[in-house]
Structure formats: structure tokens, C-alpha cells
């Protein structure tokens, strides 16, 4: 059986080293469209595996550990978005990739942190309901001032990125005055304002490569530091609290187990209703159409 392993930039080093492809959510979605393998192992969290399954409905998609979930994605239910949308009938719904398949099915288009601004800019509607990350919504609003970006739900955020404060960043910058400051747009807007560069995980890696950065203070989950150090030689300083426990649930041993298994146990197999697959595929493909 031919197997292909995808891993997100936040995964443990041993998992990244076992992967055929490592990237951010956008890169993994693009990769998933081109995979020609019997089994795809998605090393990340639940919503990532659902996107891979939607783009590969006839392939076996499995995860190393079914408990790897995203707290931000779990905060919003499809019913809540459906009800909120009724209150704003003239608004388009842009759903961040960090959502369940059921929530994606209620949207007009999906986006990732790498292309959120581009997706929102490309829509004809003046009002945009943006779910579920309020910090990313604020970042988009800043860069698309001619549209009204309505964040939903209230206080939706990634707890890891939201925990990074301006004082945290100032302290690290005072200790490393020669370092460039790079952060993820899931961070609060006031933190983004302090950065030399704001971007998705792979955009941050590309920045280090392009700018030949010798040292960075990095405001995102610490797993990215391994890839940057390995591929660019950049010294990476990360706040100690920026660790996502869900992203660390997968281990090299668990990946090895699903690679060796002739039959993967049911909890590790990603299954979606055919109608849901069609709806998720539609919003993902709409994203590709708007940003091609």
C-alpha cells in the first residue's frame, strides 16, 4: 500500500522528519489535491484531516491520534453560524480553515492565514462574516478597510497566539535587540503592530530564507522553530508558553504505528458524510478559485 504523510509546521520534530510534506494549512490543502496514494496520514489536528478527506473522498485518510483537536474550531457550532448569518443576510461568510467540516458547510468560502486578506478582498460583498478567529478578522479588517468585517463568535481566538502580549514581545526584544520580529496574524493586533513581518507559518519560514535572517523573535507555536532552524539556519527565539498541546499529541511512534498497520482502527480513520464532503470541497475550491 502506497502511503503519503502530511505534517503541519507545528508538529513535533520527529513527526516532521517522517513526513513526505511539511507545510502550513494552505500548502497542505494544495498538496492534498495532488496526492496519488492509497493512504494519507495527516499529522496535525482534526480540521486539517477533514479538509484532506474532502479533497480525497475515495482515499483512506487516517490520523495518528484521534484526540488531536483544535480548541478554537470546537468553540463554534454550525447551528450558531447559521443563526448568526440570518441576522446578516447581505454578508458573505468567510470561514477560517480552523473550523469543523460542519461549520465550513455553512460558509461561502474558506481561507487560511496565508490568504485571508486576498480572499476577503476578492469577494463582491461589502459585509463579511469572518469566523472563528477574532484576531485574524481584525488583521483582515486592517488590510481591507473598504469592507465591514464582522467577527463571529465573540471572543473567538487561538489561546496560544492570543496569550502573546506586547509586554512579552518587548521583553524578548530587549534581550535580543538584533533579532527581527515575526508573528502570526492569529496574535492580537497590537502584537502584530510591533512586528517586522506578519504571516502564516510557511510565510514566516520564507521570510527567514528571503531576508537571510540570522535571528528572529517568533510569535507563533514553537513547532515551527524546528523547521526554520533546520532549513534556514536562523536562530529562533520563541516565548516559552507558545506551545499547543493538541499539536503535540501526535508522536513519531504513533505515526509509525499507522504506517505499519494493514488495517487502521476505526477511530483513526477520517470519515465524512458524502454530502458534507461535497460542501466542504466546494468552499475549499472556491478559495483556490479566488486566489489562483
Curated annotation (Swiss-Prot):
One of its GO terms (molecular function) is 4 iron, 4 sulfur cluster binding. Its EC number is 2.5.1.72. GO terms for biological process: 'de novo' NAD biosynthetic process from L-aspartate. InterPro entries: NadA, NadA_sf. It catalyses: iminosuccinate + dihydroxyacetone phosphate = quinolinate + phosphate + 2 H2O + H(+). It is an enzyme of class 2 (transferase). Disulfide bonds: none annotated. GO terms for cellular component: cytosol. It comes from the Archaea. Its cofactor is [4Fe-4S] cluster. [4Fe-4S] cluster binds at residues 70, 158, 244. Belongs to the quinolinate synthase family. Type 2 subfamily. This is Quinolinate synthase. It comes from Methanopyrus kandleri (strain AV19 / DSM 6324 / JCM 9639 / NBRC 100938).
